[in-house]
Amino acid sequence: MKVNAKSDHKLLPKVTKVVAKGDAKGKKVNKAWLHDHINDPYVKQARKEGYRARAAFKLKEMDETLGLIKPGDCVVDLGSTPGAWSQYVRRKLSPTGAAVGALNGRIIGLDLLPMEPIEGVVFIQGDFREPEVLAKLEQALSTEKGPVKVDLVISDMAPNLSGIESADAARIAHLVELAVEFAQTRMKPDGALVVKLFHGSGYDDLVKLFQASFKVVKRMKPKASRPNSSETFLVGRGLKNVTPV
């Protein structure tokens, strides 16, 4: 479910001139951010490898560290737009690591906003809490032997941060709780959930939520996550309580 434009999720084209609105201080800040973004090694690498966003390398590091994605897996990407995480999963589930061709597994992306097609990825636009969206999800998970359970749920969902700590903490917590609830109803008992969150008010409570929901919990700060960002990730493996659909 796409809640906002993720700060680093759209690669910018080469820029020869920067025009920033606002006062002189704002212009300097915008120019500094744009300079850092354009020269970011992960942005350059994402462009080189054909990823839609540098965020692909965050999931890549977590996967390589923890072995999250395996051949034949069914993966659901919550808040999938613009598609970098789905792109990475698609390549990981390819027998040859390719962006096209054979696929050994199943990938479903869900988001409020539209997403450009990715070969092999089933995309469903809408709120995954709504009945009509859930019906499409059920169809995407169906097989001749019946519906399949999900091996991995990944969520890079993030709210627009207002700067008001209490309000931001509530929005972040809500998205994490939605992802946990989704995993509890759709995931295999030995599956895994990856969510993004931010250090600050409410962080410890979300860690406790994960610890109450999963047998193993890992805190991750991938190298591709900007050092000056409070962004971090939680990975939960093995459901403690399985909720029937």
From Swiss-Prot:
Localization terms from the record: Cytoplasm
The keyword Isomerase is assigned to this record: no
Enzyme category, top tier: transferase
Active site: 196 (proton acceptor)
Pfam families named in the record: FtsJ
PANTHER family: RIBOSOMAL RNA METHYLTRANSFERASE, RRNA METHYLTRANSFERASE 2, MITOCHONDRIAL
Protein name: Ribosomal RNA large subunit methyltransferase E
Source organism (scientific name): Polaromonas naphthalenivorans (strain CJ2)
Annotated gene: rlmE
